[in-house]
């Protein structure tokens, strides 16, 4: 297939590699091959948003942020129910906040997948979001909501005829979408390996990111206005920055140097010793240069308080090479005595944040996290995740 024609219309909702075990498609490749000035993704989660925005900015493309929700009649009831997969697209920053809140809420009702019900979804249907439905039985829930559209994608002729009928009956516009599970036809084999037999979607209709012409050929009964509408909706989307968490500012009456000096006395370390003095000076200068002081204050405070209530691991990973960590009671290993390198922990040439691994008893871990929430606020504490990839090292 000609690369130039793959993205011949603005796609509002493309699935990417971040629809884990459901779809395949590397973000960088999808964006690189996009020929329009806008592009939307809608995965089962928001994991790819930050990378998506960065890649779009590099390629001068307007990013459109969406999320695909599994919607049922009663999310609290943990039973298998008819599921409608609906896409919510943010028109502005408030729309992003709506999606974040709904995404978090849906995790509370996880049953094979994160789910929400129609009533909860309606609470967030305002002028800040666009809602697409690829199914039609529950359209009555959204009558009167002006940003609600029926989504037409390559499926059976009977299904497409029904979409047309519902559109005319309820006066709901149709928007053409590419219901993809991988980018190109030749990617089908990789998709099947990545998602596995259990999650594989098998159908005879188009599963790759289709061109406008492929969609028209597959959906002859869908009006031309459905293709123009995707471009019109893209124009309604504002350009905005994703919200960023505010770094915690630690309230301290002393400096890191003063804390290290006080701790050195307790640990019987002579800071007049040139080896220790030079190492401490070098570490503190780099920590200050990279603006990591608050991070060390927070971790030290957390570990010292935890040690009063539980066993805390002595050190693990590269942080054991830091004299500052040792003097702040974060670790219990003297890096100079054991000839450990600080540069494995923080290096002037590295842009990544320092990573301090701390071991708490399994049964006490949640209490440590709760103390952080109590100290700094619920909105300032979050878990991080790691994305595993099927690739050689």
Task: Give the positions of each predicted feature.
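Active-site-adjacent beta->alpha loops and helix N-cap segments on the catalytic face
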Residues: 45-55, 157-162
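Conserved catalytic core of nucleotide polymerization and phosphodiester-bond processing enzymes
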Residues: 63
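Active-site metal-binding loops of divalent metal-dependent hydrolases
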Residues: 14, 44, 67-69, 180
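Conserved active-site carboxylates
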Residues: 1-39, 72-149, 182, 186-302, ...
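Conserved phosphate/anionic-ligand binding catalytic regions in large, soluble enzymes, centered on
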Residues: 95, 175, 180-183, 306, ...
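Ser/Thr-glycine-rich phosphate-binding loops at phosphate-binding pockets of nucleotides
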Residues: 16, 38-45, 316-320
């Amino acid at each position: 297939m000609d690369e130039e024609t793959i993205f011949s219309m603005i796609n509002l909702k493309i699935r990417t590699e971040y629809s884990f075990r459901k779809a395949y498609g590397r973000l960088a490749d999808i964006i690189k091959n996009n020929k329009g000035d806008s592009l939307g993704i809608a995965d089962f989660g928001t994991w790819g948003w930050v990378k998506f925005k960065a890649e779009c900015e590099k390629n001068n493309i307007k990013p459109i942020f969406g999320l695909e929700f599994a919607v049922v009649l009663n999310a609290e009831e943990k039973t298998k129910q008819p599921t409608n997969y609906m896409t919510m697209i943010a028109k502005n920053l408030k729309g992003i906040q709506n999606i974040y809140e709904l995404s978090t809420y849906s995790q509370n009702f996880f049953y094979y997948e994160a789910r929400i019900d129609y009533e909860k979804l309606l609470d967030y249907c305002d002028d800040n979001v666009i809602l697409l439905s690829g199914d039609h039985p529950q359209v009555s829930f959204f009558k009167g909501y002006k940003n609600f559209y029926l989504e037409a994608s390559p499926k059976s002729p009977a299904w497409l005829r029904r979409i047309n009928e519902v559109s005319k009956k309820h006066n709901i516009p149709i928007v053409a979408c590419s219901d993809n599970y991988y980018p190109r036809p030749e990617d089908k084999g990789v998709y099947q390996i990545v998602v596995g037999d259990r999650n594989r979607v098998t159908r005879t209709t188009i599963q790759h990111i289709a061109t406008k012409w492929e969609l028209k050929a597959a959906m002859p009964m869908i009006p031309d206005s459905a293709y123009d509408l995707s471009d019109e909706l893209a124009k309604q989307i504002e350009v905005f920055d994703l919200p960023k968490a505010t770094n915690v500012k630690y309230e301290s009456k002393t400096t890191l140097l003063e804390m290290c000096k006080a701790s050195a006395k307790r640990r019987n370390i002579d800071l007049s010793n040139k080896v220790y003095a030079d190492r401490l000076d070098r570490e503190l200068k780099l920590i200050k240069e990279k603006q990591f002081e608050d991070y060390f204050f927070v971790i030290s405070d957390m570990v010292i308080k935890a040690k009063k209530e539980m066993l805390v691991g002595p050190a693990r990973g590269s942080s054991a090479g830091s004299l500052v960590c040792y003097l702040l009671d974060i670790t219990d290993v003297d890096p100079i005595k054991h000839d450990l390198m600080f540069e494995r922990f923080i290096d002037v040439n590295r842009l990544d944040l320092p990573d301090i691994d701390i071991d708490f008893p399994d049964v006490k871990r949640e209490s440590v996290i709760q103390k952080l929430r109590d100290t700094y606020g619920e909105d300032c504490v979050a878990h991080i995740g790691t994305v595993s990839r099927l690739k050689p090292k």
